[in-house]
Amino acid sequence: LLSRTPKGTELNGEATTYVDDFEGAQSNIDLRDVLSWSLSSVPAANVQGSDAPIDDLSSGHHRARLAWYTIDPVFYSSQRPSEISNNDLSEDEVRRVFINEIFPQQDLVQGQTAVQYTMDLAYYPEEKGPYNTNPYGSFVNEPSENWAGITRALSSTNFDQSNVEYIEFWLLDTFSENDELTDESLGNLIFNLGSISEDVLRDGRKQYENGLPGT
């Protein structure tokens, strides 16, 4: 035996080294379940209204409309409504995304779906969001100053102990073919991690913004 070459590692009479790809060694927290997300409170920084007093509803005067959802697979089947055409479903905003589009080197096992499950976001900066008491005229005059947000709880709160090191996501740019857009007209995507307030109205009161109490 050669030095530092264990017995039983030969292939075709030569010492062979196997490199493990550590498949399954990573743990992940899937955040795509739309039912786990709800309307966010006013961020502590970076948006209009962050510096408003706690008992001042003007903190939400720049909240715009945001929708989060998944597209029902029925729209891609023979049961889809007749008024929806193939051209409609080919638009980037609504088309299906396939796994090999994001992970071209990934092999699919037999029976595995080739469709990538996605969470879709639709932001309307010129439309008022929920709990926005700002007069409509002054709201639409400043769409570049508006914002929207959603929030959810995480099952793992100790990122160090769980060895959570980064956020991994894939974003489909639906504006790449719009020549009228400039860098100044595009928005920002911000992630806030930590202890997040659930006081949507930011009035310091338990108003059940997420619905009426059960009793």
Spans of features found by a protein language model:
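Surface-exposed, low-hydrophobicity segments enriched in Gly/Pro/acidic/Ser residues
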Residues: 1-215
